[in-house]
Amino acid sequence: MLVINMKEDLERALKNKEPSFIIKGELAEKMKKAQRITTIDKWILGALAFVFAVSFFPSTSDGLFGIIMNKILIAIGIFATFEIAIILAVILGGMTLAMMLYKNYHAEFGTDVKTEKITIKCTIKK
């Protein structure tokens, strides 16, 4: 089975529509992050919409509503910061490749026993 460690090799495999291959190393780490982003995009949009809607309410009041809103906004801010960091890491690693990979291939995540690094076994979707 074809083993891929570099971005250029992955580009070639996707272009040639290889039936199956394994991604290892740092590239596998980046592709796993990219896969995670494809599943949480809706959450990010929902969180941003919620923050926008809540921003019209005063959150500095002494009541329970103000306290709850402050805590919610802090939690969403932490969540959004974490997700933005992941998005930037994936963009630097090649988001287009990740989208092509997950659109056309089944990905099975595993761990290399020797190196304890992530591996991704990819097989083309029928």
Curated annotation (Swiss-Prot):
Chief place where the protein resides: membrane
Domain of life of the native organism: Bacteria
UniProt topology in membrane: Multi-pass membrane protein
Transmembrane region(s): 40-57, 72-94
Localization of this protein: Cell membrane
Keywords recorded for this protein, A-Z: Cell membrane, Membrane, Transmembrane, Transmembrane helix
Annotated GO CC locations: plasma membrane
Name of the protein this chain belongs to: Uncharacterized protein PM1101
